[in-house]
Amino acid sequence: MLELDLQIASETSAPDEARFRLWCEMGLRQRSADSELTIRLVDENEGRELNHTWRHKNYATNVLSFPADAPDDMLDIPLLGDLVICVPVVNREAAEQGKSVDAHWAHMVIHGCLHLLGYDHIDDEEAEEMEALERTLLEELGYPDPYAEDESADHPHSDTPSKDHE
């Protein structure tokens, strides 16, 4: 079972909770244990602040992934972590890339969930593995390959900030 906490801190229209639940369950399906996940939908100001705080970049990015660092055995329901999604950025990217808004949202949520499971795209081999899994999961949901038009270019990915700030 997925315990999903959807926090809406954006004035911009976004998908409903049922869509987020579907996309999260798909992205997390390889994890058999119950899990807790928070998704916070933000506008560009908060997205920029968080990206600056955690990654020292002064712009809002599409998705930030914050994996939990508490051991599963310490919690009633294992906390996977948090996704912060900048609604205007995701909507704008969909338009700029000629993708349906729904398909791009599904991609960003699944991409963020995979980061919470430990997937990354720092090097080419990791990126290929992660992208292949994204393609498979999105295809099962009936969405097109998010990288089909972008095979030779660098792919815009969400970012996983380090929690080594303590």
UniProtKB/Swiss-Prot annotation:
The keyword Zinc applies. Its EC number is 3.1.-.-. Zn(2+) binds at residues 111, 115, 121. It comes from the Bacteria. Binds 1 zinc ion. This is Endoribonuclease YbeY. InterPro entries: MetalPrtase_cat_dom_sf_prd (IPR023091), YbeY (IPR002036), YbeY_CS (IPR020549). Residues 141-166 are annotated as: Disordered. It is found in: Cytoplasm. One of its GO terms (cellular component) is cytoplasm. Pfam families: YbeY. Its cofactor is Zn(2+). Belongs to the endoribonuclease YbeY family. Keywords: Cytoplasm, Endonuclease, Hydrolase, Metal-binding, Nuclease, Ribosome biogenesis, rRNA processing, Zinc. The keyword tRNA processing does not apply. The lineage of its organism: Bacteria, Pseudomonadati, Pseudomonadota, Gammaproteobacteria, Pseudomonadales. GO terms for biological process: rRNA processing.
